[in-house]
């Protein structure tokens, strides 16, 4: 029987990594509080338009991948909270990289839309759609 190799990261490197993660991500409960408190955030859904229409975080703007070049709907004055489908979807991270390079302040909603739903937080549909 062989023993599994368990990583043992350098504590200083781990501290840097986790601080950067905290600086660049948020969870659904924290985001819901920011929305309630009218904090300086713009929620950005990077899922496909038809999925956005079926349900999204209230107040979110939809910027699907084919619209990233223009970054229409993002805010230069607020922190843009980017989300996609789930924890395994990397669209939000890819969008955050692209938007950050364009000068937008961005963080990622960890777990995406599915985590928001599982927390029983409000979901809205686009008027006249879905």
Label each residue range with its predicted role.
Residues 43, 60-62, 106-108:
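Conserved beta-strand scaffold positions in the cores of enzyme catalytic domains, especially
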Residues 52-58, 71-75, 116:
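Short loop/helix-cap segments at secondary-structure boundaries that form the rim of catalytic
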Residues 61-80:
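Helix-loop module immediately N-terminal to the HCX5R catalytic loop
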Residues 119-125:
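Short low-complexity, flexible loop/linker segments enriched in glycine and/or proline
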Residues 45-47, 84:
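Short beta-strand/turn micro-motifs composed of small residues
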Residues 38-43, 58-59, 79:
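Short active-site oxyanion
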Residues 74-117:
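Catalytic cysteine-centered active loop of the rhodanese-like fold, especially the PTP/DSP P-loop
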Residues 1-42, 49-51, 125-130:
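Flexible, polar/low-complexity N-terminal or interdomain linker segments that lie immediately upstream
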């Amino acid at each position: 029987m062989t023993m599994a190799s368990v990583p043992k990261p350098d504590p200083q490197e781990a501290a840097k990594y986790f601080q950067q993660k905290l600086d660049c991500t948020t969870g659904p409960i924290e985001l819901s509080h920011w929305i309630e408190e009218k904090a300086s955030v713009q929620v950005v859904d990077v899922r496909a338009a038809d999925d956005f229409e079926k349900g999204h975080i209230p107040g979110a703007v939809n910027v699907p991948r084919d619209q990233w070049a223009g970054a229409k709907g993002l805010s230069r004055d607020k922190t843009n909270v980017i989300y996609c489908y789930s924890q395994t979807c990397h669209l939000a991270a890819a969008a955050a990289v692209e938007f950050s390079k364009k000068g937008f302040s961005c963080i990622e909603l960890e777990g995406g839309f599915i985590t928001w739903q599982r927390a029983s937080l409000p979901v809205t549909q686009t008027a006249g759609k879905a």
